[in-house]
């Protein structure tokens, strides 16, 4: 067993078949969601290469209805497939991969904590949203934004300390972070808002999806450890 999960089939052969088919279905849905989100243009966010990608909903479903390890496998598969339509944006794919790993891990963690209470999915997704927002906002300030600016030649180094100094004394850069003159203030203003919007949307879709899957399989499924 790989922690708490939803188990369906009593026979080993049936369980393996379900793992393969359900994981393949979730990967297909995740690919569709990720592909479509790449072409949805949102003012200002699109200029900063920020997309609202909800593919993590299906990775989370795989983590609970199959296993955490299978969810990680299809997360990697999703990232590799993303190079087909977004091959030049390796930093964005790296960020999405980290975000997907994190949201899957946080939902698993909070499910362990709130598995026995009512409205558990609401608690799980709400806390996972807050945790992922804090993690990814901080990571953007430390790594992603400096790396992105360095890759495109905006700054001479990817060291976040030096990048922050350059940003603070260069008004031209303030456009990228909502016009906030302080680097970390701008990072938290932009990426906190972006991640809250993104993962709130993931939660709004994820809660009914998880409840629907659980209800559909309820007679065959039970939470096991």
Curated annotation (Swiss-Prot):
It is found in: Cell membrane. It is a multi-pass membrane protein. One of its GO terms (cellular component) is plasma membrane. The chain crosses the membrane at residues 25-45, 57-77, 83-103, 109-129, 135-155, 187-207. Its main location: membrane. Keywords: Cell membrane, Membrane, Transmembrane, Transmembrane helix. NCBIfam families: memb_MPN527. This is Uncharacterized protein MG350.1 homolog. It comes from Mycoplasma pneumoniae (strain ATCC 29342 / M129 / Subtype 1).
């Amino acid at each position: 067993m790989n922690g708490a999960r939803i188990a369906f089939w009593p026979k080993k052969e049936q369980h393996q078949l379900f793992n393969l088919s359900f994981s393949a279905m979730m990967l297909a849905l995740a690919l569709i969601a990720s592909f479509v989100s790449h072409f949805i243009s949102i003012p200002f966010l699109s200029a900063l290469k920020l997309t609202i990608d909800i593919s993590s909903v299906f990775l989370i479903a795989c983590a609970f209805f199959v296993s955490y390890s299978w969810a990680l496998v299809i997360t990697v598969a999703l990232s590799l497939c993303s190079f087909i339509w977004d091959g030049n944006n390796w930093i964005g794919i790296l960020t999405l991969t980290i975000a997907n790993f994190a949201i899957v891990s946080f939902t698993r963690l909070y499910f362990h904590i709130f598995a026995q209470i009512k409205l558990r999915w609401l608690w799980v997704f709400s806390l996972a949203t807050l945790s992922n927002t804090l993690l990814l906002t901080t990571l953007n300030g430390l790594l992603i934004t400096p790396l992105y600016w360095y890759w495109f030649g905006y700054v001479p180094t990817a060291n976040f300390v030096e990048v922050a100094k350059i940003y603070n004394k260069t008004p031209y850069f303030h456009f990228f972070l909502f016009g906030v003159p302080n680097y970390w203030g701008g990072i938290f203003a932009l990426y906190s808002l972006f991640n809250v919007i993104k993962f709130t949307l993931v939660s709004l879709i994820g809660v009914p999806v998880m409840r629907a899957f659980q209800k559909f399989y309820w007679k065959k499924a039970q939470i096991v450890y």
